[in-house]
Amino acid sequence: MPAQPHKQAVTDASHLYEVERRARHCERPGFRITEIQLSPTQTVPWHTHTNVSDTFYVLEGEMRLFVQNPKEAIALKPGQSYAVAPGRPHLVTNAGARSMTFLVLQGVGEYDYVPMV
C-alpha cells in the first residue's frame, strides 16, 4: 500500500528523524543546500514537498533512494545525483556498511516537509 500524506506539513523537519550530522551550507529565500550524514541504520523517512524539488548528490558512501509515482529504487554512489520533483513521495537510506554523506539542494520555492503515514 503506498504511503499517504500526513495532514501536517512542517517548515523544519530536523526534529522528525535522527542523523549523524546535519549542516546547512546555504539558505536564501526559495533555495537551500544541506549536508547530511547517515549511519548505516538511519533513514530519512517517507515524505514529500509541496513546492520544492530535492536534488541529492552523494559525497561519500552509498545511497538508496526510494520514490513513488512511479515507484522506483535508485542507487547512488559518490559523484552521482538524482532530482525528486515536488509532490513525489521519497525515502532516503544508507545502502552501505559505513556512514553515507550527501548534499540535498532544495528549491526553488517555499520549503515544507510533509511526513507520510
Summary of predicted features, one role per range:
Residues 98-113:
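A short hydrophobic beta-strand segment most commonly corresponding to one strand
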Residues 1-34, 45-46, 114-117:
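A short, N-terminal "cap"/entry segment at the start of jelly-roll beta-barrel domains
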Residues 46, 65-66, 84, 90-97:
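Short beta-strand His + acidic residue motifs that chelate non-heme Fe in jelly-roll/DSBH
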Residues 25-32, 42-57, 69-70:
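A short beta-loop-beta micro-motif enriched in histidine and acidic residues
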Residues 70-86:
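Short acidic-glycine-tyrosine-enriched beta hairpin
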Residues 37-39, 50-65, 105-107:
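Short, conserved beta-strand element in jelly-roll/cupin
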